[in-house]
Amino acid sequence: HRDMPVFLLGGTPEVVEEASNRLAKDYPNLRIAGFHHGYFSQDEDEKICKMINESGAKILFVGLGVPKQELWIKSNLGRLKGIIAIGVGGSFDVISGRLKRAPEAWQKVGLEWLYRTMQEPWRFKRIIRLPLFMALVVLTRFGLYTRRIDWWE
């Protein structure tokens, strides 16, 4: 919608540009205020936030992957003026056509994650960590575990 311009942040330069082009083509009433790839350092956050603010965007789609996108949003939301920020994971890869979505049957039964894991086997490491994470959340909640863990290294 023209009243809610969007900004895309994340992916490779080629992927985010192609995602922007496809969104503009498929949704002619959507105003793309701008886009920027996701390969930048923390030192560039202020410059990126300024670019987003100056674009006039009201919605920011952040596709930096989990948990980087959530951490980036949390760290920078105060710099973004009146902007709604949403983490979208690898959506730009799908929108750009770089990655195919799971067949509809897989989507309907909730197995799109498995299809993506087969396309990108490196995701398997994350899946293995989830039960451990849940167990540690429970143990921590009841004071049975107190050590800090860096999950994503």
Where are these regions (language model features)?
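Proline-aspartate-enriched helix->loop->beta-strand connector
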Residues: I52, G56-V66
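Short Gly/Thr/Asp-enriched flexible loops that form oxyanion-binding sites at enzyme active sites
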Residues: S20, E70-R79
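A transmembrane-helix-recognition feature enriched in membrane-embedded lipid enzymes
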Residues: R101-E153
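Short glycine-rich anion-binding loops that position phosphate/pyrophosphate groups of nucleotides
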Residues: L64-Q69, S91-F92
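Structural motif
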Residues: F7, I59-G63, I86
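Conserved beta-alpha
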Residues: H1-M51, S55
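Short, hinge-like loop/turn segments at secondary-structure boundaries
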Residues: K25-D26, K50-I52, G78-L80, A102-W106
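Short, flexible loop segments at boundaries between secondary-structure elements
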Residues: H37-D43, K81-Q119
